[in-house]
């Protein structure tokens, strides 16, 4: 069964971390492995998935966000940050009137 784009973006910590890393610009595999503290085989599996879904591209041994990735990943980052705020302060937010938001 084919994964949805939503699944590809959010269901793997490795993929999320890689996409967020590539927001800072193109990286080679050694930079990716070092920054994310991962081995080649597991991260290459995730890279292939992201490339298959046209979220990243490779050129001259550098991986970078594709045009689609450049649109989606900043929005993904914002959503993740929002989830993090709401999750950390759940008791506070559950009792607030947020209808004006």
What feature does the model see in each segment?
Residues 13, 24-28:
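Short capping segments at the starts of secondary-structure elements
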Residues 77-101:
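Amphipathic alpha-helical dimerization/coiled-coil segments
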């Amino acid at each position: 069964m084919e994964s949805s784009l939503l699944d590809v973006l959010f269901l793997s910590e490795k993929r999320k971390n890689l996409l967020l890393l590539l927001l800072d610009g193109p990286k080679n595999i050694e930079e990716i492995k070092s920054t994310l503290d991962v081995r080649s085989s597991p991260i290459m599996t995730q890279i292939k998935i992201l490339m298959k879904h046209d979220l990243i591209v490779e050129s001259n041994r550098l991986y970078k966000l594709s045009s689609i990735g450049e649109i989606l990943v900043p929005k993904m980052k914002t959503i993740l940050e929002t989830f993090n705020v709401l999750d950390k302060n759940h008791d506070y937010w559950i009792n607030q009137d947020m209808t004006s938001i």
